[in-house]
Amino acid sequence: MIVLLSPAKTLDYTKEFDVEPTAPAFLSDSAKLIKELKTKEPKDIASLMGLSDKLATLNFDRYQSWSAAKKMSADSQPALFVFQGDVYQGLQADTFNKKDITFAQKHLRILSGLYGELRPLDVIKPYRLEMGTKLKNSKGKNLYEFWGNKVQDNILKELKTNKSNLIVNLASKEYFTVVGSLPKEVEVVSPVFKDFKNDEYKLISFYAKKARGYMSHWMIKNKVTKSEDLKNFDAEGYKYSKKLSTESEPVFLRD
């Protein structure tokens, strides 16, 4: 079983942890993208990514100082602890013990515009490059064309290692698109989270992102590897709805 998450824009390099870091699988590809990004001025970055001048300058500096780091340093740390968005507030990686981290390293994958696919303990440098960015590159007009089948091939290889055909997709559509069209034998389960508001259950982005983190946390803590066990998820007030669910899209409601 592999769980897929999106990355986060908010990064934190101040945490302390006792782990053995790993290196991302596609560093040479990341370096090619950085080479492309290094040619951009702050104004180009602002236009390409829809950023303020301040954020564009920050990311210009990040690209200029980026290196294909394989070891930990002040600005090269495990993705699991660096990412700090809504999903990661729900994931609560700080609460994981060594068994949890070992399980996450085997089963959790973070999709990334710059790194393609990350294991939790893969070290990353500060960056911003969303998967939907229309960055022209050596392989095409966007990052989906750049990554091609690489991410899917790696995930299929990891599923084989895990003796499983299950992907639990907790990533956004923007990121999951990079995985491409999967073979029929692969089971993809994409949980949906809805909250009660104005007399109806609806998908509210902020809560749904956190819920993806809650479910990832719950799966890691409970060592869940089978799709039928997802129905037991009940963290933070969410409950499985048999009525609204399908096999590929289990629905969880919260009042």
Language model segments and positions:
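Internal, well-folded beta-alpha domain core
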Residues: 93-246, 251-255
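Active-site helix-to-loop segments that bind/position phosphate- or nucleotide-bearing substrates
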Residues: 4-95
